[in-house]
Amino acid sequence: MISCPVDTLIASALLMAVVLLIRVPVRRAFGPSVAYALWALPAIRMVLPPLPEELRQGGATPITQASELVYAAMAAPAPVAAPVIEGVDWNAFAVFAWAVVAGGFLLFHLGQYALFRTRLLRRACAFDRVGGVRIVLSPEAPGPLAFGVLSRYVALPADLDSRYDADEQALALAHELGHHARGDLVANWVALGVLALHWWNPIAWAAHRAFRADQELANDARVLRERGHDAAHAYACAILKAAHGGAIAAACHLHTIDDL
């Protein structure tokens, strides 16, 4: 029973390793959006059904003739009752420990996000609304950021006018609205779910960091494609001014210090 989840974890980890190896060449050849899309492969593998038992075992040769059954029964030695030894079911213990840590990981990020959202919105004031996305100003926002899946927000720092000129403000807002339009906030939660199941796996941690970097690069490319490369200087200035630490994994920040 344990082999199917283990097979899934191994297969998805191998896909993560493959994407880590090819993401840079793919980005150079086909663009950042294609490289970002590669990260769907490990997540899709996590929800695919396991291979049929006969394929995983390589297919056993059945005994088809009655005479073979009789011969096999006569030739088989009489079974010897093995002594019953009560002990720890280490497989069950390992599954339990894995599930506890995975659940704790998700609960931590859910709690962190809930506290962050409450603190940010408590002192926020409405600024604008674009489509279904509410734009707010908050002194708790370290820089422009997008968050929320059901209730969608873009938060801008309260000192927006003093930190960014008009062009930089427009580009920063376009970047964050792009995260909502592309479904990146949903992707962040899916990625956290995959990482929770792979909490023990260093490949998954490296893959998660690369996934977030590719997400930002793909969104940057979209903004520059829509606004034109003449906006590159103002966009770079907005990114530098917005860079900060302490990012929330479930949100999309304009850029963090680690990204730079």
Where are these regions (language model features)?
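Hydrophobic membrane-embedded segments
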Residues: 1-132, 143, 149-152, 160-162, ...
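Short pre-active-site segment immediately N-terminal to the catalytic Zn-binding motif
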Residues: 155-173, 207
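Catalytic glutamate of the conserved HExxH
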Residues: 171-172, 176-185, 189-200
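Short helix/loop segments within enzyme catalytic domains
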Residues: 54, 111, 174, 181-182, ...
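Hydrophobic, aromatic-rich membrane-embedded alpha-helical segments
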Residues: 46, 148, 154, 190-205, ...
